[in-house]
Amino acid sequence: MKGALFIGLMGVWSVALAEEKYPSGMTILETPKGGETQVVTGNKAEMDVAREPASTFKVVIAWSALDRGLVQDVETPLDGAEGLGLRQSLQKSINPPFALLAEKLGGEVLGEYAVRSGLIEGQIPRGWMKAGGQEAAHAADLKTTLRREHSMAVAWMRGTAPWDGEAGKKLQDALVWKGEKVLLRAKTGSYGGCLWMTGYGADKAVTVFMEGPVSRRPEILKAFFGRWGVKPSTP
């Protein structure tokens, strides 16, 4: 467990902004840049339930590829991405380029980065990528928790280890959602009945989670962007 990723998460929990209306079953965590984490809506008991990270695991693949030199920048088109670079591939959560990168990295190397990231709960199973890179794009055999997802976003926001190196800084450029009214960096995930959006702006980090089908993804985006008082321009 990486202590740096859990800064601020063990403070006093509180429910904030009770006037907001959110779908039943949605949990939102929010951490001001210099403050403590709040449960905006949902149940604190959900914090440590093991769940599939879905496409939020693509940030680990991206970070690994940047650190290993497989990807040099966020705009150069990736193999399998139909002309899109790393940033747009992350935002659109396109599977093929990340499956290809995962295969080039290999399960052992990618597993090491997964551990370093602090995102994954427990040990990385042996042979976890036996089905190939496509499995890695969703990390179906790995588990995370709401606490870990949010810890990662807080560490991004605060620029702490392990995201403070050159590759981690490039990843922050890749996480930018272009064309929005406020500058936000985030990643979505929707797979195996788990819907995620985790990231940060200049003032706070936010993680939104809900169980449900992919068709409810717009609700996740609406809740995430709504924490900054804006609506997402993309569905």
Where are these regions (language model features)?
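Short, well-structured active-site flanking segments
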Residues: 66-83, 163-168
